[in-house]
């Protein structure tokens, strides 16, 4: 089985799998609906990418792997089935990809990309497959001739149950993606239990409402007791968080916010099973953050422009707390949040929580909902966010942002939130 075709190869998670299998020696091709930064990068790396989908793209392929966004009526998927080509979802393909590896898997509703990437910086002999771009490597995949592999495991489609972890970290088990679990929290929690039970080594946030009751042996982090003297600073506009962990001394990590200390602590406790504490302390300094997580696109004395992937109230609240600290340390005038809601169902379910999350900002700008394939739900957002400015679009002009209604945003800390298209709106072509 040499020729593998990926349908939906432009996705952040599936592109990492494609890159990994290419490094393992397979001949990789892929397709997507439209060109993107990821598809262009893949082409530069030698992957044949076809835009848009067409049934002929799967001719002479031994295996087809498709993303969760691909429907049965997709022309490539349908034709592959007709020709009898083996088709695997991303979830079904994981055992094939991870089968011979010692997997260090990180799961959780929030913080898994950050925790995975910090762990990858600490375990520098491991391959890495995550759903975000590691800034120090410029990729979502690192291939090493090693048995070890750091993997960001996804609970949204229960694919984390196919990751066969040697070591499992769970950052938290807050209810997200419940539609996949029949809207039953108990089913989601049962899946987390299964994920942890498989692992030889388990590291958990023991103050999470569900995880605190986990019965099997595990390494437990109690953030309120174990993380002390958490402080933040800015060096040349770069954010850093310092903290003390248990009796292990002080650590300093790139990024801003208490949640960074929590994610780093979980990674440190996991790495302690394989490395001495001073090696961990030193390697932690190599971590440079991940793209779209408090990602500073421009910074000077008057203006800071930040791109953030936060699309759930819990994430937004934590990131805005970090933003307030940055504003205080840097002496900036105000905070402007630009919010592109992601999925109607998430917005409808968490409307009150979103309103509360944005309470501390000086200005709130709201873009149209990024539907991600969902049918629209009628919502009176102006009643929920009475002080917000609603605009159809926003674009970057130089270091400033200009809204479709003509407003210019040019001072203070400006932060964009969303998992849809907002990142492209905030960035210039070279960012």
From Swiss-Prot:
Keyword Ligase assigned: yes
EC number: 6.3.2.8
Any one biological process term the GO annotation gives: regulation of cell shape
Residues binding ATP: 108-114
Listed Pfam families: Mur_ligase (PF01225), Mur_ligase_C (PF02875), Mur_ligase_M (PF08245)
EC category: ligase
Pathway(s) annotated for this protein in UniProt: Cell wall biogenesis; peptidoglycan biosynthesis
Main location (coarse class): cytoplasm
Keywords: ATP-binding, Cell cycle, Cell division, Cell shape, Cell wall biogenesis/degradation, Cytoplasm, Ligase, Nucleotide-binding, Peptidoglycan synthesis
Origin superkingdom: Bacteria
Localization of this protein: Cytoplasm
SUPFAM superfamilies, alphabetized: MurCD N-terminal domain, MurD-like peptide ligases, catalytic domain, MurD-like peptide ligases, peptide-binding domain
Keyword Ligase: yes
Gene3D superfamilies: Mur ligase, C-terminal domain, Mur-like, catalytic domain, NAD(P)-binding Rossmann-like Domain
Cellular compartments per GO CC: cytoplasm
Reaction(s) the record says it catalyses: UDP-N-acetyl-alpha-D-muramate + L-alanine + ATP = UDP-N-acetyl-alpha-D-muramoyl-L-alanine + ADP + phosphate + H(+)
Coiled-coil stretches: none
Gene Ontology molecular-function annotations: ATP binding; UDP-N-acetylmuramate-L-alanine ligase activity
Family: Belongs to the MurCDEF family.
HAMAP family tied to this protein: MurC
Functional description taken from the UniProt entry: Cell wall formation.
Protein name according to UniProt: UDP-N-acetylmuramate--L-alanine ligase
């Amino acid at each position: 089985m040499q020729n593998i075709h990926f349908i939906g190869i432009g996705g952040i998670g599936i592109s990492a799998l494609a890159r990994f299998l290419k490094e393992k020696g397979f001949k990789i091709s892929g397709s997507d609906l439209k060109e993107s930064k990821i598809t262009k990068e893949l082409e530069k790396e030698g992957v044949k990418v076809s835009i848009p989908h067409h049934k002929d793209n799967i001719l002479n392929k031994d295996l087809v792997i498709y993303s969760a966004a691909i429907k049965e009526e997709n022309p490539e998927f349908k034709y592959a089935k007709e020709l009898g080509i083996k088709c695997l979802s991303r979830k079904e393909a994981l055992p094939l990809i991870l089968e011979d590896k010692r997997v260090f898997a990180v799961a959780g509703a929030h913080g898994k990309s950050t925790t995975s990437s910090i762990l990858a910086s600490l375990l520098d002999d491991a391959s890495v497959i995550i759903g975000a771009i590691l800034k120090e490597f410029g990729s979502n995949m690192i291939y090493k001739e090693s048995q070890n592999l750091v993997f960001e495991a996804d609970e949204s489609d229960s694919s984390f149950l196919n990751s066969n972890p040697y070591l499992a970290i769970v950052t938290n088990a807050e209810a997200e993606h419940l539609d996949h679990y029949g809207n039953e929290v108990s089913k989601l929690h049962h899946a987390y239990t299964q994920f942890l039970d498989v692992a030889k080594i388990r590291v958990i946030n023991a103050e999470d409402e569900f995880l605190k009751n986990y019965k099997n042996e595990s390494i437990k982090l109690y953030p309120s007791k174990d993380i002390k003297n958490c402080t933040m600073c800015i060096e040349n506009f770069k954010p850093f968080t310092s903290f003390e962990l248990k009796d292990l001394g002080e650590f300093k990590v790139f990024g801003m916010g208490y949640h960074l200390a929590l994610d780093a602590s979980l990674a440190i406790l996991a790495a302690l099973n394989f490395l001495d504490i001073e090696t961990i302390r030193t390697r932690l300094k190599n971590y440079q953050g991940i793209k779209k997580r408090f990602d500073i696109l421009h910074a000077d004395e008057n203006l800071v422009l930040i791109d953030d992937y936060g699309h759930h109230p819990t994430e937004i609240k934590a990131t805005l707390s970090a933003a307030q600290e940055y504003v205080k340390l840097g002496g900036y005038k105000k905070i402007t949040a630009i919010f592109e809601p992601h999925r109607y169902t998430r917005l409808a379910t968490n409307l009150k929580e979103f309103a509360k999350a944005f309470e501390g900002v000086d200005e709130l700008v709201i873009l149209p909902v990024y539907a991600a394939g969902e049918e629209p739900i009628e919502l009176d957002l102006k009643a929920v966010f009475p002080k917000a400015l609603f605009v159809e679009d926003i674009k970057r002009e130089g270091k400033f942002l200009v809204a479709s209604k003509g407003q210019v945003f040019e001072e203070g800390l400006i932060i964009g939130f969303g998992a849809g298209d907002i990142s492209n709106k905030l960035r210039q072509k070279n960012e």
